[in-house]
Amino acid sequence: MEVKMDELVLDVDVEEATGSELLVKSEPEADLNAVKSSTDLVTVTGPIGKNGEGESSPSEPKWLQQDEPIALWVKWRGKWQAGIRCAKADWPLTTLRGKPTHDRKKYCVIFFPHTKNYSWADMQLVRSINEFPDPIAYKSHKIGLKLVKDLTAARRYIMRKLTVGMFNIVDQFPSEVVSEAARDIIIWKEFAMEATRSTSYHDLGIMLVKLHSMILQRYMDPIWLENSFPLWVQKCNNAVNAESIELLNEEFDNCIKWNEVKSLSESPMQPMLLSEWKTWKHDIAKWFSISRRGVGEIAQPDSKSVFNSDVQASRKRPKLEIRRAETTNATHMESDTSPQGLSAIDSEFFSSRGNTNSPETMKEENPVMNTPENGLDLWDGIVVEAGGSQFMKTKETNGLSHPQDQHINESVLKKPFGSGNKSQQCIAFIESKGRQCVRWANEGDVYCCVHLASRFTTKSMKNEGSPAVEAPMCGGVTVLGTKCKHRSLPGFLYCKKHRPHTGMVKPDDSSSFLVKRKVSEIMSTLETNQCQDLVPFGEPEGPSFEKQEPHGATSFTEMFEHCSQEDNLCIGSCSENSYISCSEFSTKHSLYCEQHLPNWLKRARNGKSRIISKEVFVDLLRGCLSREEKLALHQACDIFYKLFKSVLSLRNSVPMEVQIDWAKTEASRNADAGVGEFLMKLVSNERERLTRIWGFATGADEEDVSLSEYPNRLLAITNTCDDDDDKEKWSFSGFACAICLDSFVRRKLLEIHVEERHHVQFAEKCMLLQCIPCGSHFGDKEQLLVHVQAVHPSECKSLTVASECNLTNGEFSQKPEAGSSQIVVSQNNENTSGVHKFVCKFCGLKFNLLPDLGRHHQAEHMGPSLVGSRGPKKGIRFNTYRMKSGRLSRPNKFKKSLGAVSYRIRNRAGVNMKRRMQGSKSLGTEGNTEAGVSPPLDDSRNFDGVTDAHCSVVSDILLSKVQKAKHRPNNLDILSAARSACCRVSVETSLEAKFGDLPDRIYLKAAKLCGEQGVQVQWHQEGYICSNGCKPVKDPNLLHPLIPRQENDRFGIAVDAGQHSNIELEVDECHCIMEAHHFSKRPFGNTAVLCKDISFGKESVPICVVDDDLWNSEKPYEMPWECFTYVTNSILHPSMDLVKENLQLRCSCRSSVCSPVTCDHVYLFGNDFEDARDIYGKSMRCRFPYDGKQRIILEEGYPVYECNKFCGCSRTCQNRVLQNGIRAKLEVFRTESKGWGLRACEHILRGTFVCEYIGEVLDQQEANKRRNQYGNGDCSYILDIDANINDIGRLMEEELDYAIDATTHGNISRFINHSCSPNLVNHQVIVESMESPLAHIGLYASMDIAAGEEITRDYGRRPVPSEQENEHPCHCKATNCRGLLS
């Protein structure tokens, strides 16, 4: 019987999302339940377990005598909690070892789904789940019933734990431990898939035997292999409960020679087995998880797809695709339990898929019931598919893929209209990563913005794109001498970075360059071709992918057949998998309710109007006479909306013709309903409005529009001159690389440059638009157009002239000769206005002046090849950061950082100036000899004759000086001089002789270039003495070198190391190097040390007590260490009534330092707090709460799970910070008005652990009693652990508040004063126990704390009975001070 995962998965947080009706129970219902509970208590229950043997007594209810999971109420710590009585086969080994020894009572194992704990419970303290005992641990009985709705949670949890235990063993194996056949990642993926499909303990025993067969025998204990191995195999094949599996797993773990395995793993250059395994092991274990929060909702394919099931995927880091199998295959998986049978499961499963949709199979399906019999088989229908594995081959050989399924993605057709789901996961499957896309789908769609093209991608293309096996590793070597870890390219032995660049074929420019389609072109295509192409479905003249009936019917067809004929009901669907008519009344346009209002009728969020205007929709709706016509209008609007959303997407690379064919196909599926007619009406009505609002022009006939009125009309020119690939080209516009700022004339050259030079995939963020007249850079066309209109109005004038698609001569294909300095100019005979007279012969760019053309030719066409190897840099521009985002950024697909190329952006002005000088010189010598070139015309609008003559004189003077100036050295010149130099004096001397005056300390740049090339130099360091006796010539005008100040030197000034001067005023104070820790707030003067260490050796760092004003005061000094007892651990008060037991798990890490990928504490935290973020907003999935410097990065409001003494790691583990004690240097001092306080003696960085708040742990009753006893003084050492601090309380229902009193027992945290702007933040830290009162309260720096600054925290506001009671004035003196402190 098929059981849905959604009905069997426990969701702890579901009651929070279902509404307030689950949280509060009405009073009449409570009274009725109370009467019912008392009646049921008499009739159902009775004396339980009174015999001394512990056997079932005759009076024991029948519902407790069966050995099966049963939901019941358990009295735990005075309150009734919902739990599951486990079957004996599901009792864990650790629980059995802790069984109570009291023989007079009868006990059973209870599983609490809320805390995932097993515990023994007295049978006298249980009640039937149908009763309503009181008091309960929840807000209502309904919440407790929802927790135990899934009776299989206990078995699934223990089976998941056992499976993870096997995965942990595999994590410790190097590659030499396993056999040769088992060193392929596909083998381990199949092993993991078989383990996740285990339905019984017998299957887990077989998996243990299979795991043993993959390990080499020399790493196993020979005595165990000889004596105990046959019996162990027999026990594995006969395993029937969790206890036997845990014992067999422990025995298998003990027989491995871990010392030899560890020696292999510690050897250098020995890679650990399956590095990919560690990235998705936790995700495999999550398929057994009892939480449903991370599962994405995927639309169910149709009845004749390859898998007739819901696709489940993880949001965080899904690596596998989970598919639901049919019920008819469950018998195969249960009956065939031998090792040979397990390997044949998949072939049997896929071979039986051919007849799953037959009428006989449909009759055999039974409704799902929440019974233990149905729940125990919930994994019988799970199949995990790995891309490229043998399962895909089995699918192909069995002929499951239908020919008619190979043209369009069917998952799009199954999206119900008006579903109203706003948080659906994208259903695109990424073949290269072997997982589903983790982004959220667009509102009203099933794809995200990145995978919109998947709607039009055929299945045959997807199958061809995914290789059967993974590519081999690259054979290249990195610059560090290690082996490259990338995959090699198909057909090569190296990756893209290490492939040989000689003889490589350039990529095809025609297919790599994609431009944005015009709306006008789409409009015209739909208008002219729709009447002819919209044919009834099934006719031979239709497109090939229209022949997919009957399985290819859209959800609109299903809606058209099953929609309610009542005009006042909504047409939306209440289900994602099939069309279920909505029962709500239609309140919007007589078709939709509030929940199912389509996206194209909602308010636009991009600052523009809707794609489908509300007025047009209302006009068309008024013309509909029947409900069928309204449904057809709805379908047409949905097709129109999705088409233009995909067309306007910048990331959609699907050709426009394919998208239009898809729209025509969708409209032709129901030709009788008139969907095509409504679509044509939409096209005719919306064409003019979309053309006007979205910034597109219909052609060159609109070019006479005023530029000042419609700036976006300039885009019309970009689509008229499109002879070659540069369709987005203006005469004044060029392209530049956003990484290195190299200039390019064509976009395709920029794409090749980014891919070959920077080894990254080209994206829009890699491209900058460049203004050719002035060289400025811009992020988008709007900014460039505004700049050109304001700064270069003559360039805008050319946009009003009729565009010329073809240049006069056809010599553009000629290639310039290398090193040629001749400038070829082609005059435009048709241009009579004097604008853009000079045209470049090689690229077609037009220029007003001949020098502009000369500089362009010198910069772009003087290299040996247009797309050759690395040539000289094109120079830096001066408006580098004028981009849309304001800074250089990179797309998410980039795998390399910008650090490797950041140094190239600096110090490039010299190279650019050299190139400009060469161009000016060539223009001066050859400008007068050029034949056939007319001089530039004067523009009387801007300059008069006097100004023009004056400018010519100034330009002649500047040109003469520029020609006499020497060139600046480039990187090659500096590097060549540094290679042959003996010291920095030699470097500067050789460069000055060749290039003249140089910038100061150019030897540092030379040393940096040598370091990048692997040349080791020492002469750049201070104090280096040349072996050849070179002595530097000291310039008296140079400033003294900078010398860092000494620590705590408040008034010291850095002077020259070679001179000893006592005149401090002769040296400018700007020579001092001031750092952050020099600005100390700690007063320096006569400070009296009262105590050298207030902890008296209990802390690893001594903490002194000082009094700054003791010498100026006549009062006797106080001794604050005498009024309390210094302790390093909190004391549990008897009022808590809590046994200090160990409820914290130990991690399975075997090394001295844990890894966040394999540590169980990180895994447990990820399950409890899936939405946790760090202080930068990033997810905390598979990350420690501390960084590499043991500073906390976890956001406030979440607890910290640290490793404990039971773990195998040492105290140097990254996940051990609080338990290591105080490390910062602190001191207790007397404040002006707040008594004693605590301040820093050194600079404390943000996130550093300062101290722990320690004292006596009390309940609220005892805390209130002590407050009354202490009185209403100005000093209180009681810290309330309420909902604002108790982070663990979010996991527990009705968690009681408690307090920590540091009055008589405490540490230095009792001296921390209050501030409304504190510099500390508190976290609950779990170390020894998961109980909230046993957690530690850690105080961490929330900002950088300077030396001498007081350490403060926020006491918060505690509710008081009256406003005048227990309120004290606040002395923090912060800008946001609240004034009063309660």
UniProtKB/Swiss-Prot annotation:
Single GO MF annotation: sequence-specific DNA binding
Mutant phenotype after disruption: Displays reduced dimethylation of lysine 9 and lysine 27 of histone H3 and hyperacetylation of histone H4 within the FLC locus and shows a moderate delayed flowering. Delayed flowering.
Residues that, per the record, bind Zn(2+) 2: C1147, C1182, C1203, C1207
Enzyme class at the top of the EC tree: transferase
Positions with a binding annotation for Zn(2+) 1: C1147, C1149, C1154, C1159
Catalysis performed (reactions): L-lysyl-[histone] + S-adenosyl-L-methionine = N(6)-methyl-L-lysyl-[histone] + S-adenosyl-L-homocysteine + H(+)
Amino-acid positions noted as binding S-adenosyl-L-methionine in the UniProt annotation, renumbered to this chain: K1234, G1235, W1236, Y1277, N1313, H1314, Y1355
Residues binding Zn(2+) 3, per UniProt: C1154, C1203, C1209, C1213
Domain of life: Eukaryota
Ranges annotated as biased composition (Polar residues): 919-928
Pfam families per the UniProt record, alphabetical: Pre-SET, SET, zf-C2H2_3rep
Domain comment as written in the entry: In the pre-SET domain, Cys residues bind 3 zinc ions that are arranged in a triangular cluster; some of these Cys residues contribute to the binding of two zinc ions within the cluster.
UniProt-recorded name of the protein: Histone-lysine N-methyltransferase SUVR5
Organism: Arabidopsis thaliana
